[in-house]
């Protein structure tokens, strides 16, 4: 803040998924001094800029399985893609979450992510999640909020033509990236060997849609 206020015309670029934690450590907010840009995994439209229709179609299965992180494009071997995603989950995503406010129940957060992964596109009951995990509903809400802030998952509120009922409807949760979702449940099997192909497509289409908001 001091740099921006004292040096005319200067621009400072900061990156990182843990930027949300800075808001609790800064003495003063940067209201009016910042512009936030969210960078999602690559969109299908971006791939189409350097791949023809045939190439893009042939790559669809890989996108459904491994997602769209840019770094994955350099790996030709599927095992390398899997190892890359495992590294992101273990050393990056979970690390960010656990460091935040000193959370120690890593197994509960991972189990919560697995439950969400198996219920992609379905209405999710917080009470049911709490019961299955053996924790309170408030803790589930807190964990979901953190997972949203580090861009692992996002919610789609329930819909009803009756606005009063809409408020009480359960949310649906989706992953920002299919690869992370599959990494959480440790399933990178090919499409013909899976029973969750519909969920993969729904999550992929939903994540593509949010990239254009």
Ranges and model annotations:
Residues 15, 39, 156-158:
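Conserved beta-strand termini and adjacent loop/short-helix elements that scaffold enzyme active sites
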Residues 9, 33, 57-60, 150, ...:
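A structure-centric signal for secondary-structure junctions around beta-strands
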Residues 4-26, 147:
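Sensor-1/coupling segment of RecA-like P-loop NTPase cores
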Residues 1:
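Conserved AAA+/SF3 P-loop NTPase catalytic/coupling segment centered on the Walker-B
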Residues 13, 35-37, 174:
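Hydrophobic/aromatic beta-strand patches that form the interior of the parallel beta-sheet core
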Residues 78-213:
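Accessory nucleic acid-recognition modules appended to NTPase machines
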Residues 17-19, 23-125:
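Interdomain motor-coupling "hinge/lid" segment immediately C-terminal to the ATP-binding subdomain
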Residues 7, 38, 212:
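Acidic-histidine catalytic/liganding microenvironments
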């Amino acid at each position: 803040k001091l740099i921006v206020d004292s040096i005319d015309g200067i621009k400072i670029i900061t990156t990182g998924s843990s930027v949300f934690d800075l808001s609790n450590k800064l003495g003063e907010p940067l209201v009016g001094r910042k512009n936030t840009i969210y960078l999602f995994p690559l969109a299908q439209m971006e791939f189409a800029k350097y791949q023809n229709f045939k190439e893009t179609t042939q790559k669809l299965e890989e996108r459904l399985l491994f997602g769209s992180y840019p770094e994955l494009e350099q790996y030709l071997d599927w095992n390398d893609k899997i190892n890359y995603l495992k590294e992101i989950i273990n050393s990056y995503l979970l690390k960010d979450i656990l460091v935040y406010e000193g959370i120690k129940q890593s197994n509960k957060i991972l189990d919560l992510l697995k439950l969400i992964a198996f219920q992609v596109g379905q209405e999710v009951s917080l009470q049911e999640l709490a019961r299955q995990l053996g924790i309170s509903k408030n803790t589930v809400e807190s964990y979901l909020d953190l997972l949203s802030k580090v861009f692992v998952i996002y919610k789609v509120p329930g819909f009803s033509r009756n606005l009063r009922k809409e408020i009480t409807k359960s949310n649906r949760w989706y992953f920002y990236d299919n690869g992370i979702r599959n990494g959480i449940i440790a399933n990178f099997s090919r499409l013909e060997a899976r029973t969750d192909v519909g969920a993969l497509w729904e999550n992929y289409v939903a994540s593509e849609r949010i990239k254009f908001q």
